[in-house]
Every structure is written in C-alpha cells, then in structure tokens.
C-alpha cells in the first residue's frame, strides 16, 4: 500500500508540516477518497491546539472534504458508491452500526463513540478514508469549490431546522453572522422563512441582508431586543461567547425554541417561568447523520445555496490557518489540494 502525503501538526499549536503515513490495508467497510478540496473549520484549530484534551500527534486535521472515490473495501462494493464518483466527508468518519443509536438512524450519537474524521487522519491530505456510510454522494450540480463547509458548518445549522420542523412560514432568528451564521441565513432564506440576524457589527448589515436576512438587529441594543418579545418560532445561537440570554428567551413565541450550536463554555441561566409560561424550550445539537447530510447536499444543490468562501492552495495551509485564527475569513476558508 502506497504512502499518503498530508500536512500534520507534530505538537499542540505547532505549524503544519509535510507528513507521509502508511494507511495500512483498506478495511472492508472503508472507502478511500482522493481529496480535491477541504475546508478549514474552527474545530480543526481546536484539535491542532489540543483545546479539548484528546488530540493525538502527529495530527492530520481537516473534515470538510470534497473529493472522488478511488477505492472501495470489499464490504463497500454494493453500497451505491463507485470509483470516480464525487463525494463528501464531514466531521464523522465511523460509527459502530449496531448500537441502538445507529440502528435507529441516529449514528451521530453512536453509543460506542462516533469516530471524528480528524482522529481517523483527516482531509489536509491527498487522500483519506472513511466508513462507506459516512461518505456522502454529491449531486452533480453542486458547486464543489464551496461545498466542503456544508459538511460541517452547514449541517450544524441545518440540523436544528429539521429537529424543530421549520417551514416557509417560520420566523427564525440567528445569533452571530460568521462561518455558521451566514450559512444558516442562506438556508433559511432558501426555505422561504422570515429571517432576523442578530449581529454586534453594524458594518455587516448590507452584506447580511444580501445573504437573505429580512432584518438585522443590533445585538448590543437592549431596546431593539426588547421590541422583539414573543416573535420567534426558533432562535439559533452560533456564537461561543456568553451573552445576556434573557432577551432572546423572551423573544420566543409560545412553543418557541432557543437552540444553541455554539459551544458556550459558561452555563446558560434560564428562568423556569420563562419556559413554563409559553411552552418554550432550550436545546442543542452538534452535526448530523448520513441521511441528514444527504438531504442537506441535495437541498443546497437544488436551491443554489453555497457558503461564502476564500480559496487557498493546500501548499499555503499555514497561511490559510493564520487567516482563520486572525478572524479575517469571509466567511469560510477552503483549501485546494495541490500535491
């Protein structure tokens, strides 16, 4: 088996270096994919820096992969995938397939522990491997250069829309207009929802309106927030910093839900009466299942929803990562493989 070229962090916080590794024999259930494009997500930086305490080095990050099938394991031969087919791989590379969560179609919550693509050797490489279930066929008309971020950032904000049965008549608010929030706005606009963006940066207003928001509200203006009481069926939080959440809880209509995908480290303080009085709820989620990923990619292709991206050659990966670290990305960075 030939070696795979990649870019790896050799230590926590280190710059990425060229690294070759032996992938071993192809597992029966695995698919090997040639990488064409791979997005950079803040989770990649967290893993490179070992923020979560379980990174293993050398670490090959990257989990927003667009590529082509180059090999199929013996148990992946008749699963609807073909050599040469365009596919995507997101945050998860493996799940056990036999626990209650997997059998019920909730593989992302695999009781044996769904294996992140990064822990499996990720997409900052010429090739990578994943279980066939997590290799997502792509529609022919999807824009492959910008599609990678849909496989992590996109599914992260699409999942709540499925969970809470959002329709064209829903009124939805989005807190934070960054890599996640801007995709949420585009998806909601494509669905026909009434979309309100909450942003602390007034300079973004015209750009956010052009993405499909119906209204932009200054999240630092208490009076503007107070005026929205009782309006929203769903508010999605995409930021990972602590805010005064009470005005957002009060902005929910009866039966409304506050859903966080932003990993806020401090506890959310929710007065019980705020929830009880209007049948309101608070929830959260991470990414999605293979089925949900397929639904997202089909919807994005049909509706022409594409993340706003900046393209770097993979050979300039350290420059691209620094660009993300500096908060300069508009709004997601994608690497083009050039091995």
UniProtKB/Swiss-Prot annotation:
It catalyses: a primary alcohol + NADP(+) = an aldehyde + NADPH + H(+). GO terms for biological process: fatty acid metabolic process. Transmembrane segments: none annotated. Optimum temperature is 37-50 degrees Celsius using butyraldehyde as substrate. Zn(2+) 1 binds at residues 38, 63, 152. Binds 2 Zn(2+) ions per subunit. Its cofactor is Zn(2+). Zn(2+) 2 binds at residues 96, 99, 102, 110. It holds the Pfam family ADH_zinc_N. Its EC number is 1.1.1.2. Belongs to the zinc-containing alcohol dehydrogenase family. This is Aldehyde reductase Ahr.
